[in-house]
Amino acid sequence: MSMKSHLELFKQKKSTAYILLTVLFGIGWATLDLPVMVAMNIRPSISMRPIKPYISWLDSLLKPLPFNSAFGTNSTAHVDLREFLLFIGLNTSPCVSETIAIFLVCCFDRSIFIATEYLFLILLPLRGLCHQFCEQKYVETI
């Protein structure tokens, strides 16, 4: 199923089951990416690449998107979402933040955004611990 047909189906059927399925899809992608993040930290030559151009690209990608109309009359929704995604981008591997960005952009639904925001705020400390553990092991081997 392509992203376009996925979004069309989501707009037509905003059923609880379909929303739950979409959230589970996002959770699945995030969970599968944890080993990738750990592997990138074990091999510092991969993880030490400059992240600033990536953050600039993500920021420019999110600017034209109509989040305010999707989230209702909340004028701060656009800024909050961009700040949240940039925060994720600074604290996780590029693979993780791309997955989150694509997932949220495709959903355009406030309830799903809130659910994923809480989920990833719970996952972030775990990712931080993985980063610390991998960095410590790398320093010990030098």
UniProtKB/Swiss-Prot annotation:
The gene is RRT16. Its main location: membrane. Almost completely overlaps INP52. The chain crosses the membrane at residues 19-39, 84-104, 111-131. Identified in a screen for mutants with decreased levels of rDNA transcription. It is a multi-pass membrane protein. It is found in: Membrane. Keywords: Membrane, Transcription, Transcription regulation, Transmembrane, Transmembrane helix. This is Putative regulator of rDNA transcription protein 16. One of its GO terms (cellular component) is membrane. The keyword Transcription applies.
